[in-house]
Amino acid sequence: MGKVYESIDDKLAGWIGRQRLFFVATAPSDGGHVNVSPKGPIDTLTVVDGRTVEYVDHVGSGAETAAHLRENGRICVMLCAFEGPPRIVRLHGRGEVVPAPDPGDGVRAVVRIHVERIADSCGYGVPLMEFVGERPQREAWLAHKGADGLRDYVRDRNAESIDGLPAFSL
């Protein structure tokens, strides 16, 4: 049976910190495409206080999360236990995008989420999986692009969402 929490206490924050990745879900206000994105590694997600989390938003192929947050602020962070006892935790809230001063290092922004609802559920449908390691492609891609290439990439490919909503501007 699921439980609704008043805040993210130390025990829940510890559980969050032991997961390998998290997912964020957003949607535009009217029509458009719902977006669910895997994020990680987990050390990019920080519990700021009992009602606030934030994560580092890396340069990537899409900009839906940022565009949707700029439009309406709605976001849900979901974490699943792929190891140990089954559990899913969802953090529903309002997010804001704090742009990085320079995406040349591979970071576009910090996404800060003011959590309005904290709940868990059984997680029985989540498979047990063994963590092997982080994929090496991201670091290789960043090195290949270089700082100027990353700035160009954000300017050219992250300016708007697939639905044409504004996301990042340089």
Predicted regions and their residues:
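Binding-site signature for planar aromatic cofactors or substrates
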Residues: 1-170
